[in-house]
């Protein structure tokens, strides 16, 4: 057995609210690295106001003036990974890499900040993403959650240092760098 069973009081996941609720107040903007709210125009902000918590945007429920793109004048597409409002009581879905592909904040009419998305990916607040905003979105979206990497590394170290049995190792493991 290489893991500990969770205690009965432990949730199997952390909710969005547990992870980012303390970042919603405007006084936190600029206090943390990469925590500046996106500058959406009034039409986009109003469009976000029609998205229910935990739901994607339903174009059919939008007023006519919000059904067309403010820059293109063409009908708005429903990109479910972009026009999706997080649910405070549930875990976040996968953060999709790409420009402006971050989901909508659960209570505010804006997309997540880079810091909020990074917190969901379990990056420590001290970690700074650099470059243009599009690159920062890509860095967060392409990242493997830090806590998963840490847990895997901890388990591998335990197995290799304490419980490695060369006789039971697979052929692949014997050909790897773990066995000399």
Language model: regions and residue ranges:
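Flexible, glycine-/basic-rich loop-and-beta segments that form/coincide
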Residues: 1-34
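C-terminal target-recognition/interaction regions appended to catalytic cores
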Residues: 26, 30-180
């Amino acid at each position: 057995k290489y893991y500990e069973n969770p205690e009965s009081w432990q949730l199997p996941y952390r909710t969005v609210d547990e992870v980012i609720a303390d970042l919603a107040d405007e006084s936190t903007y600029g206090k943390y690295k990469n925590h500046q709210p996106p500058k959406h125009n009034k039409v986009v902000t109003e469009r976000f106001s029609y998205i229910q918590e935990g739901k994607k945007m339903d174009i059919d429920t939008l007023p006519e003036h919000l059904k067309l793109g403010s820059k293109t004048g063409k009908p708005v597409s429903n990109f479910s990974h972009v026009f999706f409002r997080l649910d405070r009581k549930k875990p976040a879905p996968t953060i999709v890499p790409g420009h402006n592909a971050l989901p909508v904040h659960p209570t505010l009419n804006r997309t997540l900040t880079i810091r909020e998305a990074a917190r969901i990916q379990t990056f420590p607040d001290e970690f700074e993403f650099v470059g243009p905003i599009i690159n920062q979105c890509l860095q967060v979206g392409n990242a493997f959650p830090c806590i998963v990497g840490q847990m895997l590394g901890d388990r591998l170290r335990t197995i290799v240092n304490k419980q490695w049995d060369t006789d039971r190792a697979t052929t692949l493991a014997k050909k790897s760098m773990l066995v000399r």
